[in-house]
Curated annotation (Swiss-Prot):
Its EC number is 2.1.1.197. Gene3D superfamilies: Vaccinia Virus protein VP39 (3.40.50.150). GO terms for biological process: biotin biosynthetic process; methylation. PANTHER family: ARGININE-HYDROXYLASE NDUFAF5, MITOCHONDRIAL. This is Malonyl-[acyl-carrier protein] O-methyltransferase.
Length: 260
């Protein structure tokens, strides 16, 4: 199965900018992921308010809203590749700063009690380096909370088109975290969605920004081929077609222990 090791960040920004107005209505899996991450994060947050919280790749503000509803912090900083500051201001009850730029190479000018990210790190070119990079932005015992996707995410589309992201496995994330972090919680699972037609699958991906991976222009011939191949490979007895999501989560504490 073909895969993309990386996608140009300008394509990602363009795809998500186009999808911004439709994202919340169609990104139902991503919404459930933020709820799941937040529910488990509550178990590890210290009592009382935090000094500072950073969310990387905040997008339309799904996780941002939950964070601000359930955490009191003296300073909030949100980041995204798209300039979503106006949209965030309409959603968020607490004041915040916003930095527009690439989350993977975020320039840490201070250290945070919590760095959170949902449905963003799968776009990073070097996720292992990102884990190491987060050490510079976390206080000792600071928390890193991430929701992303595992290796079987959107596997049907990847099989038909030979295009898709190269998703790290849960065991890879565990290995990358083991050096400097205490893994507090992790899990992954699969969710099967059904759609009336393969065309509806493509529309769903467009409305959630995933078409950033598509580096070719669809012709009528390509589209008809995709529809036929998808129906034959992933048609269900109901007449609908399936699409797999593979949510993956972890919460880790920066233990600040140097290798002996």
């Amino acid at each position: 199965m073909g895969s993309l090791t990386s996608v140009d960040k300008s394509r990602i920004r363009q795809a998500f900018q186009k999808a911004l107005n439709d994202y919340d209505r169609h990104a139902l899996i991503q919404q459930k992921m933020t709820i799941n991450l937040m529910a488990h994060l509550q178990d590890y947050l210290p009592n009382g308010s935090l000094d500072s919280v950073l969310e990387l790749g905040c997008g339309s503000g799904m996780l941002s809203s939950l964070l601000q509803k359930q955490i009191s912090a003296d300073y909030w900083l949100f980041n995204d590749l798209c300039d979503v500051q106006t949209q965030l201001a309409e959603k968020l009850p607490q004041s915040f700063d916003f930095y527009c730029g690439d989350a993977e190479h975020f320039l840490f000018l201070q250290q945070f009690d919590l760095i959170a990210s949902a449905s963003a790190v799968q776009w990073f070119h070097q996720p292992d380096a990102f884990i190491a990079h987060c050490k510079t932005g976390l206080k000792t015992n600071g928390l890193l909370a991430v929701a992303t996707f595992g290796e079987d995410n959107l596997k049907e589309v990847r099989q038909i088109t030979n295009i898709g992201l190269n998703y790290p496995t849960l065991s890879q994330w565990q290995t990358w975290l083991a050096k400097d972090f205490e893994l507090l919680w992790c899990e992954d699972f699969k969710v099967i969605l059904d759609f009336d037609t393969p065309l509806d699958v493509l529309k769903h991906l467009k409305y959630t920004g995933v078409t950033a991976t598509n580096q070719k222009n669809w012709t009528r011939k390509n589209l008809n081929g995709f529809i036929g191949d998808y129906l034959s490979a992933f048609g269900m007895p109901s007449g609908k077609v399936r699409l797999t999501y593979h949510p993956l989560f972890f919460i880790a504490r920066y233990s600040h222990i140097e290798n002996q």
